[in-house]
Curated annotation (Swiss-Prot):
Species whose genome carries this gene: Sulfolobus acidocaldarius (strain ATCC 33909 / DSM 639 / JCM 8929 / NBRC 15157 / NCIMB 11770)
Quaternary structure, from the entry: Tetramer of two alpha and two beta chains.
UniProt record similarity statement: Belongs to the TrpA family.
UniProt xrefs under NCBIfam families: PRK13125.1, trpA
Transmembrane intervals: none
Highest taxon of the lineage: Archaea
Pathway listed: Amino-acid biosynthesis; L-tryptophan biosynthesis; L-tryptophan from chorismate: step 5/5
Protein name per the record: Tryptophan synthase alpha chain
Keyword terms: Amino-acid biosynthesis, Aromatic amino acid biosynthesis, Lyase, Tryptophan biosynthesis
Signal peptide start-end: none
Reaction(s) this enzyme catalyzes, per UniProt: (1S,2R)-1-C-(indol-3-yl)glycerol 3-phosphate + L-serine = D-glyceraldehyde 3-phosphate + L-tryptophan + H2O
Gene that this polypeptide is encoded by: trpA
Amino acid sequence: MSKKYLVAYMTLGYPNVNDFYKFIDNIEDFGVDILEIGIPPKYAKYDGPVIRKTYKIVSNNIKNYYEILYEVKQRIKIPVVILTYLEEYVDKLGDFLLKLKESRVDGVLFPDLLIDYVDEYEKYVNLIKNEGIKTVLFTAPLMPDDLIIKASKLTDLFLYYGVRPTTGVVIPISIDSLINRIRTMVQSKLVVGFGLNSIEDIKKAMSVGADGIAVGTSLIEEVDKNGVNGALELIKKLRGVLDEY
C-alpha cells in the first residue's frame, strides 16, 4: 500500500515572514509530502474569502516573493509547487517561469488554466515543461471527461481535483460519487482539495480511491486562531487520518 499524499498550502509570507519560515521548517517532520505556496494575484477568482484575505495582507507587506521562495527551497527537501493564476502572468509567462526556475521551485499550478485558457492549455503546459518545471493541473467535476483524461496524462506530480467551486466554501456535494467517477478515468496520482471541510470528507475521499488531499483554508484558519503551532497540530492530525489508508 503506497503512502497517501498530504499536500499543504500556505500563502507566501503569511502571516508574516518569520512565522511563515517557522511553518516551513516544521512541516516535513509533521508529515507533509508536498508544499503549495500561493503567490498573491490581483484577482483570485477561484479562491474563497479566507485565502483572499491572506493575499491582501501579503501583497501589502512583501515585495520580493522570489527571495523568499529561494529561501524556502534551502530549508526543505519536499517538492514545492507554486499556486497562482495564469491570468496574472500570461503576457510575461517566460519571465515568470525563469524566476521560478531560479528560485528552484519544483512545480506550478494555475487553477484557471483548464477553465479560462482551455483552447490553448497544451501550449502553456509545454512552455512550463520546457523550463524544467513540473506541471500540476487542476480539474473540476464540471469539466468534460476527455479534458480530465488528457490532463491526467499531462500532469506531473499529481492531478488536482477540486470538489467545490471555490476554496473554503461549503456546498452540499457527494464527495464519494465525484471521486468514484474521476477514479475510473485517470491513472495518475489523484489529490483532492478545494473544499474538503471535515475529517469525514477526507475519509470518504480516501475510501473511494483518492491518493491524497490538499489542505489550505483550514490551515490558514488555524494560523489565525492558534498560530503556527495550531496549523502544525492540524497537519499531524490529518497525517494520522491518511495513514489509516
